[in-house]
Amino acid sequence: MIRSVGLTKKFGDFIAVDNINLNVNQGEIFGFLGPNGAGKTTTIKMLTGTLRPTSGSIEILGMDMKNRAIEIKRRIGVVPDEPKIYEHLKGYEFLEFIMSIYKLDKAEMKVKIEELCDAFEIDYLDKLAGEMSHGMRQKLMLISVLMRKPEVLFLDEPTVGLDAKSAKILKELLMKYAREGATVFMTTHILEIAEKMSDRVAII
């Protein structure tokens, strides 16, 4: 599902990521553990096609990122470490915007959104994103990705800003999606989170 060989990223003379080799299987929750500044976010950006590697190869869902990036991006989901939500949109408007991008069925998505909002105990979809706390925006971003059930899910420090109960709910949802065949790649700087939420852990 997720493969990389010799993945390297340099910014001038600075080596941000050096020779990363990954092999993540379908239905696996893979933890990528390391301290802040170790290159976790840079690695995810390369794996998801938002940052071009200096060298190395990436394969997602059996497709080469160099040649089929557009198709790959439609079949994966990404939750960045900083939720990127337009501050002038209300929560439900942001979710409708995501539906329009991916041409999702609104009736079907409404059911999934209600299920996820109930799970995360969210009752603020009529609030402007700019008025939400980091934790609120993080949950909204998670819902916007989880509602469409991507085949591969990339999560960059997903528990930051979440309380213990919400983190537990996220773990249960990820385990459910993995059982259904989805693949999860998750970064964290917390060893306990990596051990509790992952099937395997790699350290950078």
Predicted regions and their residues:
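ABC transporter nucleotide-binding domains
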Residues: 2-4, 9-203
